[in-house]
């Protein structure tokens, strides 16, 4: 077991694309944890989606042994964290397991919105922070300006920031020395009752549930009988190991160390992330402070295109929820789409990633309904209901007022794009709170309704600013809004999957847009199909799909007009009856395209 004074637990935090995972690769390479022939870029990003999109989704851990300049060998436990706003929960869990952070800032781009958000999380976790300036070999790198920015915007002393290039491998030993000399060692007592924090858990087809732990007090050993304090489940450990970066089994894990344990756990609900593991025969007096549970902000329905896949979808969601503690789901049914699940996500990228993982890893074909947020309905009788699905909205007569969630957004961008971004925020009912300039970049603080952000705000922001703006938000609370439920009727029948809550001022525009889209997507039938958007009983937009005409006069060559008239009248009668009883088939592709409308 390593002496506590020679252990360093640290995480790497940064904005998207500032080079966290590349720096992690270089640290692994420098410490010789993996042979050169097995080395590959973004070594710790082991999901296909992560490698393709070039983003980190799951926080990963690895143990490195580093011989420092003072001659001692140090055990470094590294957590590589995601940079995207939707995965902030992964970051908060990683930070809780460490004592220090390396803050990576791109020397050409400077401090971005997500840099700020992650730094504030690290400061809340009482971390010692070492600033590292990456990409110093780029022609556009401006080290003095970025150092000044770190001091002005974040308030960290950047005079002794480590200057590196992770890609070229310049000054990597400088980072390792800074970790050893400037970050604090963990505290803990090997003789105390066992307390180990569950940082993450995932399902392995051979081992059952694999639990990633950080030992605080006591020690974990193979064959030990342990109890999960939140669920009360008891298990005997059959494996104790570390990631280095491959799985390696060890006899024990002591205080301050990170590793994994397995105990033939089948039920994924036994291992709650943030729970404390203790020894069955020497229970710890109190559990460790866990993480604040994440609150989903975006909800949408996931339905299998083939109803026979419903059970597979349920099982797949269970396995994903184990690996992603911030993802929640419950069963729902829809008249248009059959049985499926109402799922809660941290944001739109999170939704997209979960959908893509279900389709790839579990070979499922899915339909996603329009994303919505959680509204609070204050009823006339004084009760308050939360509504996740617009189709479940009670009768408007019974509702006193509706409240919607608002966010406080930090937007950082080059000042030449400021006009377009201000206009975008105003269109989305935003309230400007602050505008400051830091060396050619503007920092905007806006309050916005979350409903306006979940559709396509991020994409629009990126296109207006040519990709230079960065965006981060925190939930502010609920405020009353003039909100209405917009129903879509096809052939006078409401389609529950297309119902949405909109602000009254935007209802007509949204309704017209959706009706026009559906008109192009629903195939023509032998009778006329009206498509309407309605608020309550009032129709606000309408499009009509013309009927296909069957030529009933094809076989009448010349002849008497009354014969033709009889055939035409008979056709007219049939069409009238058809319009009354005919079913309109809305193809799946029309649903998917209509639901994607808001995201374009």
Curated annotation (Swiss-Prot):
Domain tr-type G: 5-187
Alphabetical GO biological process terms: positive regulation of translation
N-terminal signal peptide: none
Keywords per UniProt: Cell inner membrane, Cell membrane, GTP-binding, Hydrolase, Membrane, Nucleotide-binding, Protein biosynthesis
Main subcellular location: membrane
Cellular localisation: Cell inner membrane
Positions with a binding annotation for GTP: 17-22, 134-137
Known EC number: 3.6.5.n1
Topology in the lipid bilayer: Peripheral membrane protein
Enzyme category, top tier: hydrolase
Keyword Membrane recorded: yes
Claim: Nucleotide-binding is one of the keywords in the record: yes
UniProt cross-references to InterPro entries, sorted A to Z: EF-4 (IPR006297), EFG_III/V (IPR035647), EFG_V-like (IPR000640), EFTu-like_2 (IPR004161), G_TR_CS (IPR031157), LepA_C_sf (IPR038363), LepA_CTD (IPR013842), LepA_IV (IPR035654)
Reactions that this protein is recorded to catalyse: GTP + H2O = GDP + phosphate + H(+)
Function text: Required for accurate and efficient protein synthesis under certain stress conditions. May act as a fidelity factor of the translation reaction, by catalyzing a one-codon backward translocation of tRNAs on improperly translocated ribosomes. Back-translocation proceeds from a post-translocation (POST) complex to a pre-translocation (PRE) complex, thus giving elongation factor G a second chance to translocate the tRNAs correctly. Binds to ribosomes in a GTP-dependent manner.
HAMAP family cross-referenced by the UniProt entry: LepA
NCBIfam families (UniProt xref): lepA, small_GTP
Protein name: Elongation factor 4
Species, as recorded: Rhodospirillum centenum (strain ATCC 51521 / SW)
Gene designation: lepA
């Amino acid at each position: 077991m390593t002496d506590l004074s020679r252990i360093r637990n640290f995480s790497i935090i940064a904005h998207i694309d500032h080079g966290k995972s590349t720096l992690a690769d270089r640290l692994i390479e420098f410490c010789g944890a993996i042979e050169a022939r097995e080395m590959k870029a973004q070594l710790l990003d082991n999901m296909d989606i992560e490698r393709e999109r070039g983003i980190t989704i799951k926080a990963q851990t690895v143990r490195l042994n580093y011989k420092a300049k003072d001659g001692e060998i140090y055990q470094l436990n590294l957590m590589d964290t995601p940079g995207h706003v939707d995965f902030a929960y992964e970051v908060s869990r990683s930070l809780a397991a460490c004592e220090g952070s390396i803050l990576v800032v791109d020397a050409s781009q400077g401090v971005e919105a997500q840099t700020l958000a992650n730094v504030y999380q690290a400061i809340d976790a009482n971390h010692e922070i070492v600033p590292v300036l990456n990409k110093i070999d780029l022609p556009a790198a401006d080290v003095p300006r970025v150092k000044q920015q770190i001091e002005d915007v974040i308030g960290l002393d950047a005079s002794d920031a480590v200057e590196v290039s992770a890609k070229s491998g310049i000054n990597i030993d400088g980072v390792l020395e800074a970790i050893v000399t400037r970050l604090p060692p963990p505290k803990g007592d090997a003789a105390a009752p066992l307390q180990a924090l569950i940082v993450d858990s995932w399902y392995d087809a051979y081992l059952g549930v694999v639990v990633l732990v950080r030992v605080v007090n006591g020690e974990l050993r193979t064959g030990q009988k342990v109890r999960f304090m939140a669920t009360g489940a008891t298990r005997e450990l059959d494996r104790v190991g570390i990631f280095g970066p491959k799985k390696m089994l060890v006899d024990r894990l002591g205080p301050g160390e990170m590793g994994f344990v397995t105990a033939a756990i089948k039920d994924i609900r036994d291992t709650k992330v943030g729970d404390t593991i203790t020894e069955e025969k020497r229970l710890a007096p109190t559990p460790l402070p866990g993480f604040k549970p994440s609150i989903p902000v975006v909800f949408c329905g996931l339905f299998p295109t083939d109803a026979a896949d419903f059970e597979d979808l349920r099982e797949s969601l269970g396995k994903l929820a184990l690996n992603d503690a911030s993802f929640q789901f419950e069963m729902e049914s829809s008249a248009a789409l059959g049985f499926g699940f109402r799922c809660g996500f941290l944001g739109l990228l999170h939704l997209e990633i979960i959908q893509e993982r279900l389709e790839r890893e579990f070979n499922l074909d899915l339909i996603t309904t329009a994303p919505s947020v959680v509204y609070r309905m204050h009823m006339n009788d004084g009760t308050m209901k939360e509504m996740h699905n617009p189709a479940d909205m009670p009768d408007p007569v019974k509702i006193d007022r509706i409240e919607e969630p608002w966010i406080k957004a930090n937007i950082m961008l080059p000042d030449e794009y400021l006009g377009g971004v201000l206009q975008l925020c105003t269109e989305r009912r935003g309230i400007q709170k602050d505008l400051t300039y830091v060396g050619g970049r503007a920092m905007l603080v806006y309050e916005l309704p979350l409903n306006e952000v979940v559709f396509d705000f991020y994409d629009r922001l990126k296109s207006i600013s040519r990709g230079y703006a960065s965006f981060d938000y925190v939930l502010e609370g609920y405020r009353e809004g003039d909100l209405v439920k917009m129903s879509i009727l096809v052939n006078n029948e409401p389609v529950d999957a297309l119902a949405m809550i909109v602000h009254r001022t935007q209802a007509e525009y949204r309704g017209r847009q959706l009706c026009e889209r559906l008109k192009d997507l629903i195939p023509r039938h032998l009778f006329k199909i009206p498509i309407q958007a309605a608020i309550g009983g009032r129709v606000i937009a309408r499009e009509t799909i013309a009927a296909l005409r069957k030529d009933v006069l094809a076989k009448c060559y010349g002849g008497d007009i009354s014969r033709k008239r009889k055939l035409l009248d008979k056709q007219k009668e049939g069409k009238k009856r058809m319009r009354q009883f005919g079913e309109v088939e809305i193809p799946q592709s029309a649903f998917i395209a209509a639901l994607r409308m808001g995201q374009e």
